[in-house]
Design a protein with these regions (language model features):
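N-terminal Rossmann-like NAD(P)+-binding domain of SDR-like oxidoreductases, especially those catalyzing
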Residues: 1
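Conserved beta-loop-beta element that borders a ligand/cofactor-binding pocket
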Residues: 5-30
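Substrate-positioning beta->alpha
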Residues: 6, 34-39, 52-76, 82-85
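Glycine-rich Rossmann NAD(P)(H)-binding loop
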Residues: 28, 52-58, 84-92, 124-125, ...
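A short C-terminal helix-loop "cap" of Rossmann-like NAD(P)-dependent dehydrogenase/epimerase domains
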Residues: 40-53, 107-112
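Residue-level signal for the nucleotide or nucleotide-sugar donor/cofactor binding architecture
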Residues: 63, 92, 132, 143-147
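Mid/C-terminal beta-alpha module of Rossmann-like enzyme folds, strongest
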Residues: 71-133, 154, 165-197
Length: 197
């Protein structure tokens, strides 16, 4: 059976001066889905604790919209057939991401770091780190607009302000976010810990 080539591969093989960008977990105002909502929502709800599966160690490389734009500008000035990874200069863990968001919003909470995935699921929960090699982009002259903590502020503030209206924020029953915001299960866990002490 013949293998079907992906659209980026087909574009690259034409020899035309087309640059294909491969970002990872995109963040920025208007991001869909806005993954950082799992922590922003907790702050808005004044949750006393943040639960993180795999002890928050999961790393799935983030990509700021501002960094994508910076790479597009460089690639457009030097047209050639190529495929470039696009990612932030750092690759924060889920724990680091939660801390960046809480700090920006002036919120403090207890960190409940769990070894399993029964609670504390989040969008960066991967067994093995996913980190993109951006050396080709850097060799082209690309300079990131900023690291994760610097660039994610735009999305955080956008979410706190209500996005672009009610429909731009995740619905409480959204299948992507609902498992990450199971407050009833978390409260039960915290209550059990208090009674066993």
């Amino acid at each position: 059976m013949a293998r079907t080539r992906s659209p980026p591969s087909r574009l690259y093989s034409t020899g035309l001066p087309v640059t294909v960008l491969r970002p990872s977990k995109i963040h920025g105002a208007g991001a869909a889905p806005p993954r950082e909502w799992v922590f922003v929502k907790r702050v808005l709800d004044r949750r006393p604790a943040v639960f993180l599966a795999r002890r928050g160690a999961g790393v799935d490389h983030t990509t700021a919209a501002a960094n994508i734009a910076a790479l597009i500008e460089v690639a457009a000035a030097k047209p050639a057939p190529r495929i470039l990874n696009s990612a932030d200069p750092d690759a924060p863990s889920a724990l680091a991401i939660s801390r960046v968001i809480a700090r920006h919003l002036g919120h403090s909470w207890k960190e409940v770091l769990l070894d399993d995935r029964s609670l504390g699921r989040h969008p960066w929960d991967v067994e093995h780190p996913i980190v993109l090699d951006t050396s080709a982009a850097l060799a082209l002259g690309y300079e990131p607009a900023g690291d994760y903590a610097t660039t994610v502020v735009e999305e955080i503030d956008w979410l706190v302000a209500g996005g672009d209206g009610p429909r731009s924020l995740p619905d409480p029953g959204d299948p992507f976010f609902a498992p990450t915001l199971d407050y009833a299960a978390e409260d039960s866990y915290l209550a059990r810990r208090r009674t066993t002490r």
